[in-house]
């Protein structure tokens, strides 16, 4: 799964997820893309689950790109522990997602195949998404 090799601090504050995303909101590599339409956090496990769902459906044809990286640590306290007594231990890594962010890109496959692959991938993600296509102008 995806995770940073080295970080300055083990724990981070959650922060606010407001506003839209300007950087990373256009297709850079492929012909088709999956774009987020709401804010949220996507964990490394969810990114990998969506990637596997896509690649299995297209039978490893064409090429896919993952445009997000989980660089924010999230923590969790153990089960049945009372509140307080400090912040929990680091549990995993997540990517902060704002509306407009391109999550995945795909090329070298037909339109219908890409659309269905992204639909299967979207079921694995906690944010609402839409299918986008490169404008040939």
Curated annotation (Swiss-Prot):
Keywords: Ribonucleoprotein, Ribosomal protein, RNA-binding, rRNA-binding, tRNA-binding. The gene is rplP. InterPro entries: Ribosomal_uL16, Ribosomal_uL16_bact-type, Ribosomal_uL16_CS, Ribosomal_uL16_dom, Ribosomal_uL16_sf. NCBIfam families: rplP_bact. Belongs to the universal ribosomal protein uL16 family. GO terms for cellular component: cytosolic large ribosomal subunit. Gene3D superfamilies: Ribosomal protein L10e/L16. It holds the Pfam family Ribosomal_L16. Residues 1-19 have a biased composition (Basic residues). Residues 1-20 are annotated as: Disordered. This is Large ribosomal subunit protein uL16. The lineage of its organism: Bacteria, Pseudomonadati, Thermodesulfobacteriota, Desulfobacteria, Desulfobacterales. Part of the 50S ribosomal subunit. GO terms for biological process: translation. Binds 23S rRNA and is also seen to make contacts with the A and possibly P site tRNAs. GO terms for molecular function: rRNA binding; structural constituent of ribosome; tRNA binding. CDD domains: Ribosomal_L16_L10e.
